[in-house]
Amino acid sequence: VLFFNVDSDDWLHQDSLLQISTLSQQALAKADSAGIIALKSFADGSIIGNKFIHDGIFHTFRDLELLGQGGERSIVFRTAIASKFRFPLVSGEKFMPEGIVYDKYHDFSFLISNRSLTICEYQENGLSSNPKALMLRNPGCYKLYYRNRIDMAASIKERLGYILRYNFFAHTYKGTDVEDYRGAHSLLVRSMKALNCIVSRSYK
């Protein structure tokens, strides 16, 4: 059984369900496959972002990110796996970045397809129209996101970027739902708190 989440301002191509049915035969044949990742397009047919470098093979979310192939995608999940990874709740906040859940799929791969399954129409006043304001309204959610990413970093540069953002949102967040980072890089996290002013300027 598959699960396909479509945003309220998006719609499907006439043959999207048929395409999903066809792709699912290959996707579900692999035991550690969590579903399908395909493209999104605008109403004029132009693709959102870039086409995948590798079509018809399996990648994890992290693989795609490291290849520079992330971004807006149509994602079809295997329901049995998706049901294990729920969005956490942070009191008083309304937006949780999808990456918090996607990062939990590190042991699962997805069939990659260069077919567009979703037609997207961005709303002028939609959630993503002002990302900085959205993040500032949900500091606990972004504290959690960047906290989890610190140990995932593939390079020191990437890790430092996550730590800077984590420290900023940890300082901004006044709630108690999200615990502080206590991983292997705790000393580095603490030593970089003085750099909060640098990140603060970027959110003004």
Residue positions per predicted region:
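Membrane-interface aromatic/basic loop that binds lipid-linked glycans or pyrophosphate carriers
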Residues: 171-204
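Conserved donor NDP-sugar-binding/catalytic core segment of glycosyltransferases
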Residues: 15-50
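Structural register within alpha-helical repeat arrays
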Residues: 163-166
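Conserved nucleotide-sugar donor-binding catalytic segment
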Residues: 43-132
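Short beta-strand-to-loop acidic/aromatic patch adjacent to the donor-nucleotide binding site
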Residues: 1-11
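Catalytic core of nucleotide-sugar-dependent glycosyltransferases
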Residues: 117-123, 130-156
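Alpha-helical elements of Rossmann-like donor-binding domains used by nucleotide-donor carbohydrate transfer enzymes
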Residues: 15, 19-22, 100, 104, ...
